[in-house]
Amino acid sequence: MKEHELRSLLGKVKDGKLTRRAFINRMLMLGLTAPMASQMLDFVGVARADTKFNYKPTKRGGGGALRLLWWQAPTLLNPHFATGTKDQDGSRIFYEPLAGWDADGNLYPVLAAEIPTRENGGLAADGKSVTWKLKQGVKWHDGKPFTADDVVFNWEFASDSATAAVWSGTYKDVKVEKVDDFTVRVLFDKPTPFWADAFIGTAGMIIPKHLFVDYKGAKSREAPTNLKPVGTGAFRFVDFKPGDMIRAEANPDYHVANQPYFDTLELKGGGDAVSAARAVLQTGEYDYAWNMQVEDAILKRLESGGKGEVHVVPGGNIEFIQLNTTDPWTEVDGERSSLKTKHPAFSDAAVRQAMMLLVDRKSVEDHIYGRTGVATANFLNNPERFRSKNTKFEFNVAKANDILEKAGWKKGSDGIREKGGVKLKFVYQTSINAPRQKNQAIVKQAAQQAGIDIELKSVVASVFFSSDVANPDTYPKFYADMQMYTTTMSQPDAERFMNQYCSWEASTKDNKWQGRNPSRFRDEEYDKLFRASQGELDPVKRAAMFIRMNDIVVGEERGVIIPVVYRPRAHARSKTLRADISGWDNDTWAIARWYKET
């Protein structure tokens, strides 16, 4: 679609000649997400329908205890340092963004009074600013008022390079100004049609200025409130034992009437996914269990217990293997996996190509994940029409052997291939979880047949996904040759998801390993495409840019990742629990509206 055709369609919607729904459906056919199409309509001033939630309770409280199981336990409760989903989910119990993404990919206001549109004056005609009106009467859990000063402070906090915030990429290229006590303006340096990033969803949780102002920059990790959150959410802090448990109680001053339904909340961490599933589906000890990364055959057997159900929600999450582009075994200036090094084996495209052929994705789907994981060749998988059609996966040990042989990697007396004094011996790490260990074993067995020796390393999940910068075994540090985990797609637009392979997001000592690119992949074409996509209005051109980015990182020539299975979000819940879950936000995004049918 050409730009003039797109503008013509937008004009027809504005003039009432084409319905909003018809426009969005047409954009979906072109491979655009519904939220992106919706933002286009907002940009030209077409009114949106408000998100409707089915919440039945007519008073606050009275629901007793809400019991949650996160088998990867939260270790920190500051959203700006939450590298792992578990810490983001834990933080979201207490902290809120200006807006979030509902299950259909629509924006809904949380701490904002309304979603900015052209119609209400929130979106500038030139596309270079967004004005947010804040909800009034909101209080922090300590009784202090929530104001524009808090919003501006969060931008200052996250954009300060010395803070090394996880979401610095969201905030460093914008400016935020206070208009009045309950209005802020986000300024872009160029027209930005897809503006819904800063202060939204996972990256948008807002911390209180009055408790963090003395802990900006290099002192940010010292703030006592990192472990004792004071937010605006429906539940307020009672106790936190990192790696074990969170306890909270209903916020009597919550800014939404009749919420929350539950009087108390306990999030129990640790254990494993199977025991978490059993505690909800079979014994009924808990109401909700997160991330059912369990063999599907086991889930079906546990569901027969009758206490709960497994729910699968569409999203964009991907289980994948990363190949380290740097040398994890050489230290430079006090840093392993330094950008000043190259991986001794994976710098050879032939070795990377061979590893791609040695991952039996279809077997992983068929024998491990079932309905909760679909074999894929793509990093970017959702929406379906957004997937690259240029890629395919293949499991072929003989072909891998042939590639290595032709590239000069010869088998030694021990059966391990080597070249120039470098042996194909790799450490392959992931978190402790039965499906992941089975996946590792499948890869190890195939690699052995190709003359590659793989040492399997399994790290406790709460350690592997820890936000503790002193921990050497976290996935952002990537002190191994290969690693596997699931990365979550936390918004329906692909921009934030695809920035994980931008060169400026490389995880390094300088940014306290908070960069979103642990593989340290650096590619000039990728960077240029990403920058161009940020200002591209034509949905077809923009989709093509993301598809090309996907093809670069998974491709034979320069690729450094091996997608394994696309993972819709699967969770277990009590049959009486009513919980809104979005594939585009944290599991705890709408916890204020959770309730039980009696």
Listing of model-derived features with the role each one plays in the protein:
Residues K2-L18, A22, R26, D50-G61, ...:
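Extracytoplasmic/periplasmic ligand-capture domains
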Residues W70-E119:
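Protein kinase glycine-rich loop
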Residues A22-A47:
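N-terminal export signals
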Residues V166-K216, D239:
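Surface-exposed binding/hinge segments that line
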Residues H80-A82, A198-I200, F379-L380, V469, ...:
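Short aromatic-enriched loop/helix-cap "lid" or pocket-rim segments at secondary-structure transitions
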Residues R67, Y108, T131, T183-R185, ...:
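General beta-strand recognition
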Residues V564:
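Active-site-proximal polar cores
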